[in-house]
Amino acid sequence: MAAFGGPAKPLLSLNPQEDAKFKKEVAQVRRRATKQQEKQKPTPGVIYVGHLPPTLYETQIRAYFSQFGTVTRFRLSRSKKTGNSKGYGFVEFESEDVAKIAAETMNNYLFGERLLKCHFIPPEKVHEELFREWHMPFKRPSYPAVKRYNQNRSLVQKLRMEERFKKKEKLLRKRLAKKGIDYNFPSLVKVLHKNEENASNTGPQNSRKHQALRKKKKAASVTPETPEKAVDSQGPTPVCTPAFLEKRKSEVAKMNDDDKDNEIVFKQPVSGVKEETQETQSPASSKKKRRRKHNQ
């Protein structure tokens, strides 16, 4: 069995004189076979999938769309800043016909409380770098410069930082002087120290005190609305000029009008009053008639 193992040996004809012809024929047969295989291979189709829920990942979406056919490539677009899903992606199927069927069936399909939007992308409009590094798992972007700047520094590191700021400040002032610009600005190191002091002073206790003081100030500023101004009898009396008297009369008239409007008056009909007068007069007339009869 060991003799049959190993790489395949080159094909040789039985007649050594016709070896060259035999090799040419074999090459032609192989070319025809490859061409037939290429013709039989279906052209791939790409579809756009929109309104995807943010909780879905690449593996889940690919597994879902693989029920229509073999998915060769898939790309879910993500934000470069946060790494979160943008809500749309691209799916490439092995066959173009399968891609069209998947786009038709999944368009306006209720998926995770959302209507999916799917449409077929023609091969002319598919970008060459659409599926670049599609097999690589997405990593959230890290910002090392921001982390370095916000890290907690020791005293030595802070002193080095101050020296760097001073050098930059000197260079800036020299450049401005060369260009003939008279501009004075505060040193950057002092500004940094002020910011650090403010950050240290604003603690949880200080912030609570500030909030309590602000609340007290607001309560003092908001005065209760008095409906009428109280007149102080012991205060100084105003000068009685004719203009002042006219103003006072107009104010009193307005007050009376307001009081009249507030009062509710019920008016009784006139017929009822007449009936009451007749009823009250009837007993007196009947007594007079009785007296006359008695005298007769």
UniProtKB/Swiss-Prot annotation:
Superkingdom, natural source = Eukaryota
User: Which positions carry N-acetylalanine?
Assistant: A2
Do you know which SUPFAM superfamilies this protein is assigned to?
A: RNA-binding domain, RBD
Q: Where is this region: Interaction with MKI67?
A: 229-272
What are the record keywords, sorted? Acetylation, Chromosome, Isopeptide bond, Methylation, Nucleus, Phosphoprotein, RNA-binding, Ubl conjugation
Identify the InterPro entries for this entry: NIFK_FHA_Ki67-binding (IPR021043), Nucleotide-bd_a/b_plait_sf (IPR012677), RBD_domain_sf (IPR035979), RRM_dom (IPR000504)
- Could you tell me where the Basic and acidic residues compositional bias lies? 18-28, 245-257
Q: Cross-link named Glycyl lysine isopeptide (Lys-Gly) (interchain with G-Cter in SUMO1), where? A: K274
Q: Where are the stretches annotated Disordered?
A: 1-45, 196-296
What's one Pfam family here? Answer: hNIFK_binding
Q: Which residues carry this modification: Phosphoserine?
A: S221, S233, S250
Domain RRM span(s) in chain numbering: 45-123
Specify residue ranges for compositional bias: Basic residues.
Answer: 207-219, 286-296
**Which compartments is it annotated to reside in?**
Nucleus, Nucleolus; Chromosome
Q: How is it modified after translation?
A: Phosphorylated.
Give the modified residues of type Omega-N-methylated arginine.
R248
Cross-link (Glycyl lysine isopeptide (Lys-Gly) (interchain with G-Cter in SUMO2)), chain numbering: K139, K179, K274
Cite the GO molecular-function annotations of the record.
RNA binding
Annotated Gene3D superfamilies:
3.30.70.330
Q: Which PANTHER family match?
A: MKI67 FHA DOMAIN-INTERACTING NUCLEOLAR PHOSPHOPROTEIN
Q: How does this protein assemble?
A: Binds to the FHA domain of MKI67; this interaction is enhanced in mitosis.
* Protein name listed in UniProt: MKI67 FHA domain-interacting nucleolar phosphoprotein
**Organism lineage string:** Eukaryota, Metazoa, Chordata, Craniata, Vertebrata
**Gene from which this protein is expressed:** NIFK
